[in-house]
Design a protein with these regions (language model features):
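Hydrophobic alpha-helical segments, chiefly the membrane-spanning helices
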Residues: 472-476
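Alpha-helical transmembrane segments and immediately membrane-proximal extracytoplasmic
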Residues: 1-461, 467-469
């Protein structure tokens, strides 16, 4: 870290380091994130092409075959690389808080590949969690190749920021979200390289890829009379987020207790195919379904069915082992809940534009509680809607949702996963560092023992000060 009396030469070298790390990780992280997203879309598109013109049963069987193939692929990856478990955003957070521990980049790349297989096959999982962890692994790998005076957590944070920025096209939100959810601080030393990575990743996307923001919405003026409805939606979003997260953890614990991973994967694939035959919107990432909600193209009953189906499908897929993220499903659930709230608001006499506003607000409220980044999610809303009014409504609902979910569940889904593994980030980084140190490592064997005679001498021999006092005349 530079001091106030830093020489111009040292300052120049530090700036070069910051720019180098930020640009390299921004380019690599942006490329990796875009390739992942486009890869999922390309493979899923090939599967959907085979389903065109088929009967509902035939199309369902094609999707089931793809999911079964994905289940075998995931199981094969885990066995081939001897993975004890899949890694995800929780490991990226833990890696940033344990800079002295080696970051498991290899496991990160393998886990991202498994998530690619799962999402491409049509499992109800998210893509941004794997992309986030992929970015963190890229950052850690860059540090292994090009170490500098920057700390390891900054490399990880740069990779995450690049991935988020490329995925959403929201560099400001990426910087804040990383500082809020990954680093858990806003230190100046970290902001510069993270910002460079986020902006470079955003710039890389249009240069090399034909991609736009995954969600599209037309902002409209906000009726501030909706604020009580927004507060109520925030409370409902917290309850939905808690149900979602608890269901995921309990299903995963149940599946693990059975100790038959392949059977659980095949069961997840079969159940997902059945749900998809009944509610096609629940299949895969659900990006188009969310855009349909944002456009107001669903009926009340359809949105309610989509919410229930997506909740069940995601719990089945992730809980039973089809690896993937939780952010996209959280956005889907929040959009469905907000859409329902919008219909209620219209019934209470508000303008039809309330449906769009509350759909966006619901997305932010549920996602903010699940990933533990309320301000970052609000900024994502602001950047993809370009609406100050939408952002204000979102921050009100997100604050209410996060307030409730933090007290009734945990700071985020990832924090709860870490607590289950014995890592409580609320205790601080010092606590995590002490967990890595064994008391036995501090034991000193070369101790000189004190005999009984030496102890008597030490106890009975007067100190020089006592002898001096004994020679002093009494004042009496």
């Amino acid at each position: 870290m530079l001091l106030l009396n830093t020489s111009p030469k040292e300052l120049g070298l530090e700036l070069v380091r910051v720019l180098f790390v930020g640009v390299v990780i921004g380019i690599l992280g942006g490329l990796a994130a875009n390739l992942f997203v486009l890869g999922v879309g390309a493979i899923d598109g090939l599967i959907r092409e085979q389903m065109v013109g088929q009967s509902a049963l035939s199309a369902g069987l094609i999707r089931w075959a793809a999911l079964i193939a994905g289940a075998f692929g995931i199981y094969g990856l885990k066995q081939a690389f001897k993975m004890d478990r899949w890694h995800g955003p929780a490991d990226a957070i833990l890696g940033a808080h344990r800079p002295d521990a080696p970051f498991p980049a290899r496991e990160g790349f393998i886990s991202t590949t498994a998530a690619l297989v799962s999402a491409s096959a049509g499992a109800s999982v998210g893509q941004y969690g794997p992309v986030l962890h992929f970015g963190a692994s890229v950052g850690a790998q860059v540090r292994a190749l090009f170490p500098t005076r920057l700390t390891p957590d900054i490399y990880v944070a740069c990779g995450v920021a690049a991935a988020i920025s490329a995925g959403f096209g929201a560099p400001i939100a990426a910087v804040v979200l990383v500082s809020e959810a990954i680093l858990r601080h806003f230190a100046v030393r970290a902001v510069a390289p993270i910002t460079v990575s986020a902006i470079v990743a955003t710039a890389v996307t249009p240069l090399f890829f034909d991609r736009v923001s995954p969600y599209s919405v037309t902002a409209s003026p906000t009726d501030w009379g909706l604020l009580p409805v927004v507060l109520g939606l925030g409370a409902c979003a917290a309850i939905l987020a808690i149900v979602f997260m608890r269901s995921l953890l309990r299903t995963a614990a149940w599946a693990k207790s059975l100790n038959n991973e392949l059977a659980m994967l095949l069961l997840a694939a079969t159940l997902m195919a059945l749900i998809g035959m009944l509610v096609p919107e629940a299949v895969g990432l659900g990006t188009q379904s969310v855009n349909d909600l944002l456009a107001g193209e669903k009926l009340f009953g359809e949105a309610a069915l989509m919410l229930v189906a997506k909740l069940g499908a995601t719990v089945v897929c992730i809980g039973l082992g089809l690896v993937g993220g939780v952010f996209s499903p959280a956005l889907f659930l929040g959009a469905s809940l907000g859409y329902l709230a919008g219909y209620v608001a219209v019934g209470l006499g508000f303008d039809s534009s309330a449906v769009v506003i509350l759909t966006v607000v619901g997305m932010a409220a549920v996602a903010g509680s699940v990933i533990g980044a309320p301000i970052g999610v609000v900024l994502i809303v602001f950047e993809f809607t370009r609406s100050y009014e939408f952002a204000v409504a979102a921050i009100l609902a997100v604050s209410m949702s996060s307030f409730i979910s933090t007290r009734l569940f945990c700071y985020s889904f990832f924090d709860r996963q870490l607590v289950a593994r014995g890592f409580d980030l609320r205790q601080g980084r010092e606590f995590l560092s002490l967990k890595d140190i064994s008391v036995a490592d501090l034991d000193v064997e070369a101790v000189e023992s004190v005999t009984e005679s030496m102890a008597c001498l030490l106890y009975t021999s007067p100190s020089p000060r006592d002898r001096t006092r004994s020679r002093m005349p009494s004042s009496a």
